């Protein structure tokens, strides 16, 4: 199984992402959820997940700080950012340090699947350790509608068809 962590200072977002996709069907195990950057960074160092799905703006340590430190330590974790910030500087900094992808909130399920696929199928990236055959062409399992407050729901569970 591929190990992945989630980090966002809004727990409803991490819970929603957990329920958005049938991760187990993709061969991915979510091994931790974190609400601040320091805890997420400690988990990356301690658990060495193949994938870290991070909010770019968190208390304690920003996502850019995390990827900068990971880059300096030559961590093998693929980092995907999820952010409400559309400023070019955030995306540029993230990509300069080797982020696999930078997704804007509201996260679109299909875009998240494509970002995860990049992590799993990208041999030039040092973090790929999974040798199995994962099928990303399907729907990764149909999910029932997730109950979250109406004001937050659109932030993480739209599909491309709804745009």
Predicted regions and their residues:
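Active-site residues of response regulator receiver
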Residues: 8, 55
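Acidic catalytic/metal-coordinating carboxylates
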Residues: 36-39, 62-65, 83
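Acidic, metal-coordinating helix/loop segments flanking the phosphotransfer/catalytic sites
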Residues: 33-51
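Two-component/phosphorelay signaling modules centered on CheY-like receiver
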Residues: 11-32
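As written
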Residues: 49, 63, 75-76, 95-100
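Interdomain helical linkers/hinges and coiled-coil/dimerization scaffolds
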Residues: 93-95, 99-163
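Short amphipathic alpha-helix used as the core "switch/output" element in two-component signaling
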Residues: 42, 64-75
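Receiver (REC) domain active-site loop signature in two-component systems and cognate sites
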Residues: 58
């Amino acid at each position: 199984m591929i190990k992945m962590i989630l980090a966002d200072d809004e727990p409803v977002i991490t819970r929603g992402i957990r329920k958005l996709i049938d991760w187990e069907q993709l061969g991915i195990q979510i091994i931790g959820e974190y609400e601040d950057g320091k805890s997420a960074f400690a988990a990356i160092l301690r658990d060495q997940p193949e994938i870290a799905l991070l909010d770019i703006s968190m208390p304690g340590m920003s996502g850019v700080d995390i990827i900068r430190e990971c880059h300096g330590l030559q961590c093998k974790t693929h980092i995907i950012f999820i952010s409400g910030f559309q400023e070019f500087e955030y995306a540029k900094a993230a990509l300069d340090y080797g982020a696999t992808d930078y997704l804007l909130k509201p996260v679109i399920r299909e875009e998240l699947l494509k970002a995860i696929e990049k992590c799993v199928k990208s041999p030039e990236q040092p973090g790929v350790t999974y040798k199995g055959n994962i099928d990303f062409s399907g729907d990764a399992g149909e999910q029932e509608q997730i109950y979250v407050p109406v004001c937050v729901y659109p932030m993480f569970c739209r599909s491309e068809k709804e745009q």
